[in-house]
């Protein structure tokens, strides 16, 4: 992304339509970064907690350059806890953590929060993840069972978000269900994972 620009979508995402909407949005609001933020992790709306499973940026995006620099120079050679300790030593951990759960695992989120607070001035085009990729999660109050019922055993009615993000617990046993044909025709799983 730093050198060539483009779109990064984590493999644990389900695309329900082409990514043309990203280009349309970019033309409308020329930002140096497009992505999603998670409101439930955000305490300070001026610094939304940006997710890293979807990123779109033009070549040379200052945000991507700064984020990569922070990650490669301060995070990657440390464990998650060591990076937390590093931020505590700087006196910024509680500020950048906001409501991020599992900060030792989500060190890339912390690194982005650190550069947003310490450098700033970036042009971001962010959408609330709870309204799109996590909409099905929100409808099921973030429970795995309600999400799997929506993915596997409910026919798609109406519009889906262009992207559905599956977290690690959401993916657990999903292949088991698909391999055994445990889904209904017309469901998200049937349309976008099996290709019926």
Regions found by a protein language model. Name each.
Residues 11-196:
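Glycosyltransferase-associated regions of secretory-pathway enzymes
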Residues 1-9:
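A conserved donor-nucleotide-binding helix/loop in the catalytic core
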């Amino acid at each position: 992304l730093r050198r060539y620009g483009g779109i990064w979508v984590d493999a644990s995402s389900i695309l329900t339509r082409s990514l043309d909407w990203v280009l349309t949005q970019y033309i409308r609001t020329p930002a140096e970064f497009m992505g999603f933020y998670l409101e439930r992790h955000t305490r300070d709306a001026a610094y939304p907690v940006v997710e890293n499973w979807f990123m779109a940026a033009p070549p040379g995006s200052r945000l991507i350059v700064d984020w990569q620099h922070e990650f490669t120079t301060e995070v990657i050679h440390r464990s998650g806890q060591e990076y937390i300790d590093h931020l505590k030593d700087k006196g910024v951990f509680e500020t950048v953590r906001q409501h991020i759960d599992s900060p030792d695992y989500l060190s890339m989120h912390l690194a982005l929060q650190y550069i947003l607070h310490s450098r700033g001035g970036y042009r971001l085009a962010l959408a609330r993840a709870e309204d799109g990729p996590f909409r099905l999660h929100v409808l099921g109050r973030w429970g795995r069972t309600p999400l799997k019922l929506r993915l596997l055993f409910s026919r798609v009615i109406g519009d889906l978000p262009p992207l559905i993000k599956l977290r690690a617990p959401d993916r657990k046993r999903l292949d088991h269900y698909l391999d055994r044909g445990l889904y209904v025709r017309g469901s998200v799983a049937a349309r976008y994972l099996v290709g019926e």
